[in-house]
Regions:
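Residue-level marker for buried hydrophobic side chains located in beta-strands
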Residues: 1-3, 85
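Alpha-helical metal-binding/catalytic segments enriched in His/Glu/Asp
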Residues: 3-57, 181
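Metal-dependent peptidase/peptidase-like ectodomains
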Residues: 11, 49-158
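Soluble non-cytosolic domains of exported or imported proteins
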Residues: 16-24, 38, 53-57, 103, ...
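Solvent-exposed, polar/charged alpha-helical surfaces in well-ordered, non-transmembrane soluble domains
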Residues: 24-31, 60, 64, 107-114, ...
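Sec-exported extracytoplasmic/periplasmic mature domains
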Residues: 28-38, 63-71, 114-121, 139-142, ...
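His/Asp/Glu-rich mid-to-C-terminal helical/loop segments that flank catalytic regions of hydrolases
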Residues: 31, 35, 42-45, 154-200
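Acidic/histidine-enriched alpha-helical segments
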Residues: 39-51, 79-87, 194-200
Length: 200
């Protein structure tokens, strides 16, 4: 299983909200798990992608080379892979998860979100979120999810604009996101079974 986001950004700015924030959250989630002495039953990989902005080439290359897909053939790791959680929608706080049409995970994620209800993390969107690295997994029939976030000024001011700079980052929101991501990763890594896959 894995958590992560993409390293590359558009050339007009430093890419603070797209997607240095997502990378920082994934790194901090791993640091949290290490700091609390977590002993997960499954390996948790941090997956930091190149060339997301050029068509998800980093994540799609990883899936193609290491996991495969049912149409073209799978690797031995395909059946063992559990889930990938992604952050790539700006600096805003997590509010839930896009389910990508996988209703089998609804009760699982709902239970995992309960400790964060007081922070407003309570939404499970039935809709698919497109255009970022979890899609490489989802399109190969593997569980891949993007967290649902507050938009802040993401689409209006920072997304692919020259204003995507450090002072637009909201540190307190990113701290909450790191805790939620760490919790989801730990829960997924401690399950007896991989995360359920949606019907194809």
């Amino acid at each position: 299983m894995g958590i992560g986001g993409h390293l590359d950004s558009w050339h007009t700015s430093t890419g603070a909200t797209d997607n240095a924030g997502g990378v920082a959250v994934a790194l901090e989630a791993m640091r949290i798990l290490e700091a609390i002495g977590a002993q997960p039953r499954r390996t948790i990989r941090i997956m930091l992608w190149s060339n997301e902005e050029g068509g998800l080439r980093g994540s799609r290359g990883y899936v193609r080379n290491h996991l495969g897909n049912p149409e073209d053939g799978t690797t031995p790791d395909y059946d063992d892979f559990s889930v990938y959680f992604n952050m790539d929608n700006g600096t805003g706080q997590f509010r839930g998860v896009h389910l990508q049409g996988n209703q089998l995970v609804r009760p699982i994620f709902s239970a995992w979100m309960e400790p964060f209800h007081d922070l407003g993390v309570r939404t499970l969107s039935q809709f698919s979120n497109r255009g970022t690295d979890h899609l490489a997994f989802d399109q190969a029939g593997l569980p891949g999810f993007q967290f649902l976030q507050d938009r802040i000024d993401y689409r209006a001011r920072t997304h692919h604009f020259n204003m995507d700079v450090f002072d637009k980052v909201l540190p307190e929101d990113l701290k909450i996101n790191a805790v939620v991501m760490a919790s989801f990763a730990y829960h997924a890594a401690m399950r007896d079974e991989p995360i359920p896959r949606k019907a194809r």
